[in-house]
Regions:
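RNA pseudouridine synthases
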Residues: 1-267
């Protein structure tokens, strides 16, 4: 039944049917039933589709792929069922808490070419974030640091001595009371890079449940709290299409709201 429903995947994220051939040492992924899986009350928006690519505007709080307590309430599973695209695979990823533009591959034959764009840093990515305003912070600036996983928390990335392995261009877009909107252009793609870099500068992103300190983990049966989304948006992405040779540019239609206290202060 699970095989027929497409709930068993191979390592590439492709569904294995009942008649799929067996390969030695093949790993498969089983989509288990989650009776208590919470419904994520936000929808993705389709921005573009051709024979090779699907471009989606992801909402906050929706995981990219099955993990933990989320299976059906993930962007990949929703899109596969909505569009009937069994070959759909994400080319890159956004954190569950982050909203914005994300690309999916439709055809296995061209997938590697698109993945190589990200590996070889041939993609221009632009993010927006809302974080505290610091009048002593010189902007624009290029921030470099060496980020490694914190062995105490495992969830956080922390700066350590050594050769930098992460780089982000940071610019001020506008100020709003005690808050500011920043434009972030990552050159590298370390885990939590943008969140960790702004935290290093003393301006952690509004609504961040990981930086500077971990928020308490809610009980497993607790209702999700959607009142404070992470104020981080993957606003735009641009690249030369490796298959067609065309210049591609896509932009999110979402916006980030100012934190309530900033609005109160401005009023």
């Amino acid at each position: 039944e699970r095989l027929r429903a497409g709930d068993v995947l191979d390592d590439a994220g492709q569904p294995l049917g009942p008649d799929a051939p067996h390969r030695v040492r093949q790993r498969v992924w089983y989509w288990r039933a989650l009776p208590s899986e919470p419904r994520v009350p936000f929808e993705a928006e389709l921005l573009f589709r051709d024979d090779e690519l699907l471009v989606v505007d992801k909402p906050h709080f929706l995981p990219m792929t099955p993990k933990g307590r989320y299976l059906h309430e993930t962007l990949l599973v929703r899109l596969k069922r909505q569009l009937g695209l069994d070959t759909l695979v994400p080319i890159h990823r956004l954190d569950r808490e982050t909203a914005g533009v994300v690309l999916f591959s439709l055809r296995p034959a061209s997938r590697q070419a698109y993945q190589a764009m990200f590996r070889d840093r041939q993609v221009e990515k632009v993010y927006e974030a809302i974080a505290p305003w610091r009048d002593d912070l010189v902007l624009p600036r290029e921030h470099l640091s060496r980020l490694e996983e914190d062995p105490q928390t495992f969830m956080q990335m922390r700066p350590v001595p050594g050769e930098p392995n992460s780089r982000t261009h940071i610019a001020l877009m506008e100020r709003h009371g005690d808050w500011a909107r920043y434009e972030l252009r990552p050159v590298t793609g370390r885990r939590h890079q943008l969140r960790a870099h702004l935290n290093e500068l003393g301006i952690p992103i509004a609504g961040d449940r990981i930086y500077p300190t971990l928020w308490p983990e809610p009980p497993p049966d607790a209702e999700p709290d959607y009142r404070q989304p992470l104020a981080l948006l993957a606003r735009a992405i641009a690249f030369t299409d490796p298959v067609t040779g065309q210049t591609r540019a896509f932009e999110s239609r979402r916006t980030l709201a100012w934190p309530a206290q900033s609005q109160d202060a401005a009023g």
